[in-house]
Amino acid sequence: MDSVAYIIVLAMALSVLFFAIAFREPPRIEK
C-alpha cells in the first residue's frame, strides 16, 4: 500500500510541476 501511495504522490507532484510550467509560459506547441 505504501508503494501505491508513493506513486500517487509522485504523479501529483509531476502534474503540479507540469501545470505550473504550462501556465507560466504561453503554449508554443501547435497541433
Curated annotation (Swiss-Prot):
It comes from Picosynechococcus sp. (strain ATCC 27264 / PCC 7002 / PR-6). Found at the monomer-monomer interface of the photosystem II (PS II) dimer, plays a role in assembly and dimerization of PSII. PSII is a light-driven water plastoquinone oxidoreductase, using light energy to abstract electrons from H(2)O, generating a proton gradient subsequently used for ATP formation. This is Photosystem II reaction center protein T. PSII is composed of 1 copy each of membrane proteins PsbA, PsbB, PsbC, PsbD, PsbE, PsbF, PsbH, PsbI, PsbJ, PsbK, PsbL, PsbM, PsbT, PsbX, PsbY, PsbZ, Psb30/Ycf12, peripheral proteins PsbO, CyanoQ (PsbQ), PsbU, PsbV and a large number of cofactors. It forms dimeric complexes. GO terms for biological process: photosynthesis. Its main location: membrane. Belongs to the PsbT family. Keywords: Membrane, Photosynthesis, Photosystem II, Thylakoid, Transmembrane, Transmembrane helix. InterPro entries: PSII_PsbT, PSII_PsbT_sf. It is a single-pass membrane protein. It is found in: Cellular thylakoid membrane. The chain crosses the membrane at residues 3-23. SUPFAM superfamilies: Photosystem II reaction center protein T, PsbT (SSF161029). The lineage of its organism: Bacteria, Bacillati, Cyanobacteriota, Cyanophyceae, Oscillatoriophycideae. GO terms for cellular component: photosystem II reaction center; plasma membrane-derived thylakoid membrane.
